[in-house]
Amino acid sequence: MARFSFPCFPNFGGFNQAVTNRGPEISETADNWVSPSDIPLIEPNSKEHRMREAQLGGHTLRSHGMTVARTHMHDWIILVLLVILECVLLIIHPFYRFVGKDMMTDLSYPLKSNTVPIWSVPVYAMLLPLVIFIFIYFRRRDVYDLHHAVLGLLYSVLVTAVLTDAIKNAVGRPRPDFFWRCFPDGKALYDSLGDVICHGDKSVIREGHKSFPSGHTSWSFSGLGFLSLYLSGKIQAFDGKGHVAKLCIVILPLLFAALVGISRVDDYWHHWQDVFAGGLLGLAISTICYLQFFPPPYHTEGWGPYAYFQVLEAARVQGAANGAVQQPPPQVNNGEEEDGGFMGLHLVDNPTMRREEDVETGRG
């Protein structure tokens, strides 16, 4: 059966082939290398499976999916609570601040439709990264990576959404098109204190008091910012080899998020300060959430989640206690390779297996 490949990642299939070719030898040394009882989140039932536990490709949805999810049950419960809190914030009435006649100069821009529809924001901020995570899972077969990427992304977007809407309701800043929301017929009316007396549609007026910060922008940077960090770790964008093509891949999601923010100013739905604050908020939350599950992208182990390396360390400690000869844990080889992929683009595989294969084939 033909093996699926992706042009930009020609080396990524090498690890799976190496495991297949070395299956008998791996099985013979399995008992001496790892004892599964001390590996967290693992319940292996065969000798061959025990060896694959500590190797990339051994943690699949079928074998470990439910176990990993149960281990992080409290995280998923908090995630559901965040969804409920976000729904409550969408119902809460925002603060209606004083809007005087002299302020209308900056609030009389045309009332336009959204260049980027509201329904499209979850699509590119959440569904697009999820599709990429799933694609990489089918290439690597690492449920830790998939689970933590999905959980981190959802936390990034939902925490950002809750903070954004909470600030929106508390600040109540009028949008640049507030005049036409408040006075759709163009006839302004003010009370004795000089505050506006709006006679437009109540829902439109209510939405007009939610300018700061920009929700489109914060959502965009929280989702696509997380994706950018994830991709930079997977392709080792900061490995010191000088492949500019890697940076292009990392910057592309951020560029799209920035363009979304610019569209909010062009549509007169937000002031530039709203967009700047929204982008800063989304990018900060996405970075914090990413670093909860993954090493920094510039780290030599930035290609995998913390949980994967914790499994390897547990296996190493157990092997040392049993007096077994240990293999070094996988690390990213920072040296240039002949088969470094198209313009240096490839997903990082397991360098330990690659080194052993090189020795056998005479390339080492």
UniProtKB/Swiss-Prot annotation:
A GO molecular-function annotation: phosphatidate phosphatase activity
Catalytic activity, EC = 3.1.3.-
Supply the SMART domains for this chain: acidPPc
Q: Does the keyword S-adenosyl-L-methionine apply?
A: no
Main location group: plastid
Extract the InterPro entries matched here. P_Acid_Pase_2/haloperoxi_sf, P_Acid_Pase_2/haloperoxidase, PA_PP_rel
State if Phosphoprotein is listed as a keyword.
no
What family is it from? Belongs to the PA-phosphatase related phosphoesterase family.
Q: Can you say what this protein is called?
A: Putative lipid phosphate phosphatase 3, chloroplastic
Q: What is the lineage of its organism?
A: Eukaryota, Viridiplantae, Streptophyta, Embryophyta, Tracheophyta
